């Protein structure tokens, strides 16, 4: 009779541990989802800023149609991207196009001196800082989640409960490029 109780005790302990591991992994997964939603908010703000920036530049550099079209195409692509990997690739293209757009201000002193352009470029720089901070938080949450599903003994239950590795938010740039915030000078 006592071995029966021991077996029941071991089973109860395993079930309790499985519930604990499951709840911890769910919490880590929710943290990743929330962190990605935070990035998404910042990216949407940047997407909303772009048409105003393009219109301002268009007023001073209308013959730079190729650059303006590149920015609009990259914005549309970024807005339709889904998931960290696809969003990261689309946002990388958008960042490059925005960099070329901002660089136009060097060739057009009147544009560079325009108060609206200065305000929009300043807002863009602030958003880039917020995006970088949100990206670091997201990647930290992904690292913690991926570690959680790989550590023993939770790894025994992770696959059974359907927990899989999550992708980092990668902009396809080197670490120094990602951590270097664009500097907008007037």
Model-derived regions, located:
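A helix-centric hydrophobic-segment signal that preferentially recognizes long
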Residues: 2-186
